[in-house]
A protein has these predicted regions:
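The conserved Walker
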Residues: 12
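Conserved lysine of the Walker
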Residues: 16
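Glycine-rich phosphate-binding loop used to anchor ATP phosphates in small-molecule kinases
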Residues: 48-104
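NTP-dependent small-molecule kinase module
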Residues: 1, 6, 22, 26, ...
Length: 153
């Protein structure tokens, strides 16, 4: 079964949420925005390394529940370190790398560009990227003829 859990990550102000909002309806995905989840569910968590890792773990868990129900799940948040990305779990990672510095100096200092990612978005054009990603991800989900034959064995 293909991975249907998507992490859209990058610096604050890079266009993560805009891209997630454009991509979600194209995939029929549930979209979790980290700022909204933090405000409504995880308001007791701060921005320490430990709390950031816990926020990432919980965001990953929310997405996992959606995927278990058979749907695409998208989470958009900074996910600034390898540890936070590891805590989020296995996923398709879309790195929105459209700015060199975000709004928050502490996040700029903490942010580690990912070594591994599936897609790198380099310009703020959410309509273009959402269409491109949806088409590519939809292709990714469809079985190939070879897989269909093997599945029938």
């Amino acid at each position: 079964m293909p991975v249907k859990k998507i992490l859209i990550m990058g610096l604050p102000g890079s266009g993560k949420t805009t891209l997630a909002r454009a991509l979600a309806p194209k995939l029929g995905a549930v979209h979790w925005n980290a700022d909204a989840v933090r405000a409504e569910i995880n308001s007791h968590l701060g921005f320490s390394e430990k709390d950031r890792i816990e926020q990432a773990r919980r965001m990953g868990w929310l997405c996992d529940q959606v995927v278990k129900a058979g749907h695409w799940a998208i989470a958009d948040f900074v996910c600034p370190t390898k540890e936070t990305r590891d805590a989020f779990g296995e996923c398709i990672t879309i790195w929105v790398d459209t700015i060199k510095e975000g709004r928050f100096e502490d996040t700029n200092k903490l942010f580690e560009p990912p070594v591994k990612y599936d897609y790198k978005v380099t310009e703020q054009n959410s309509d273009f990227w959402a269409k491109f990603l949806a088409e590519d991800l939809d292709f990714y989900e469809k079985p190939t003829f070879f897989k269909a034959i093997l599945k029938g064995l």
